[in-house]
Amino acid sequence: MLNADHLHVARDGRAILNDLSIRIAPGCVTALLGRNGAGKSTLLGVLAGDLPAGGLARGATVRGGVALNGEPLHAIDAPRLARLRAVLPQASRPAFAFSAREIVLLGRYPHARRAGALTHADGEIASQALALAGATALDARDVTTLSGGELARVQFARVLAQLWPPPGAAQPPRYLLLDEPTAALDLAHQHQLLDTVRRLSRDWNLGVLTIVHDPNLAARHADRIAMLADGAIVAQGAPADVLRPEPIARCYGFRVRLVDAGDGVAPVIVPA
């Protein structure tokens, strides 16, 4: 379990997260919804260890507790933490002309037995991760020439390579934290990526927290929904329980209605 308890985050005297608690369970995809500026990326940063709880971090005051598999997050050293959780931040374009394969291989360095010494097996994992991300054709491409959507798929392959399970070894639960992974993707690739995330959450026993802006995507691909507004979780639970007009209006300040899609999976959320 990756859990945060009673988080308070403030920056420049302004509260960003206020007494927030959340649990990310292995084998489960949790979608985090909220309007722009609600604190979603801040929460993900705290859970990732980029904003450590218990003091000042990057100009923010952070209070509260975060634990990963029962261990305080701040007590886990960086190499071990990198093997237990992977983070896909919002889109950022590399400044150097790495190939897509070289970017994906960055995810394997936490597993190297000697600094910088990757193996043939790491290369095989990179190839499989690119295939899972639908990015095999981009293998040799210079990442500075890729479109936003192509780069997003390569970076997704990188975090898959980072959490790739070793053969025959029991693994502690691991966690995948995704910040708007579908923002640059077309319709088909949005659903393909989230389908892959949900399948791997079960096959690899991953706890997943993904920030998404489209509640319709969350309804179809998440096991649980957490809605964030004014620095607090205002609703959380199964999609059918949470994605209703009243909680959505509270989360987004926007009235919606539900339309039967006719497929028995989830209703479509449209403006009221």
UniProtKB/Swiss-Prot annotation:
Domain ABC transporter: 2-255
Compartments in which it is found: Cell inner membrane
Principal location: membrane
GO cellular component terms listed in the entry, alphabetical order: plasma membrane
Transmembrane segments: none
UniProt entry keywords in alphabetical sequence: ATP-binding, Cell inner membrane, Cell membrane, Membrane, Nucleotide-binding, Translocase, Transport
Membrane topology: Peripheral membrane protein
UniProt GO MF annotations: ATP binding; ATP hydrolysis activity
Binding site for ATP: G34, R35, N36, G37, A38, G39, K40, S41
Pfam hit, one: ABC_tran
Family: Belongs to the ABC transporter superfamily. Heme (hemin) importer (TC 3.A.1.14.5) family.
PANTHER family according to UniProt: HEMIN IMPORT ATP-BINDING PROTEIN HMUV
Subunit structure: The complex is composed of two ATP-binding proteins (HmuV), two transmembrane proteins (HmuU) and a solute-binding protein (HmuT).
Protein name, per record: Hemin import ATP-binding protein HmuV
Organism: Burkholderia mallei (strain ATCC 23344)
Gene this chain is encoded by: hmuV
